[in-house]
């Protein structure tokens, strides 16, 4: 699946905002979150380097943090905070996640209201994703179809 979002010109953002790519990776038992040593859990992803598309940054960061290889991604939405400008993607990944690089821990969560110590930004993104996933809009229906297909492919592999 090709990410069409990269065809759009970058929205003009204040210079002090960090351009981040954030992944929602649904595993069979929940959404993957990661944490560095002594830190809170966060959705995987990271900062885009100068001249790097956020979708490219996401592929690199996911590999560095979890060892997963992204097979495809679907742009979901932008999430702007006072410090970060996230592009949020649903990612279909291959492999078994393992903490790597700066990440020490991983967990799977089934609700944005999990009691896990989760960054506020990640919790807000997960709430928005849960709403989108439950919508009867074309995007919500497409999202559910993609997840169903990803689960089928995982069983076949």
Predicted regions and their residues:
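A short coil-to-beta-strand element that immediately follows conserved catalytic motifs
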Residues: 69-79
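A generic fold-level signal
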Residues: 16-18, 26, 83-84, 101
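Conserved Nudix-box catalytic region and its N-terminal flanking loop in Nudix hydrolases
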Residues: 26-65
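Acidic, metal-coordinating catalytic segment for phosphate/diphosphate chemistry
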Residues: 1-22
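Active-site-adjacent beta-strand/loop module that shapes the phosphate/pyrophosphate-binding cleft
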Residues: 79-113, 121-136, 142
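Short histidine/acidic/glycine/proline-rich micro-motifs that form metal-
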Residues: 48-49, 113-115
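Acidic/histidine-enriched, glycine/proline-rich intrinsically disordered or flexible terminal extensions
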Residues: 134-155
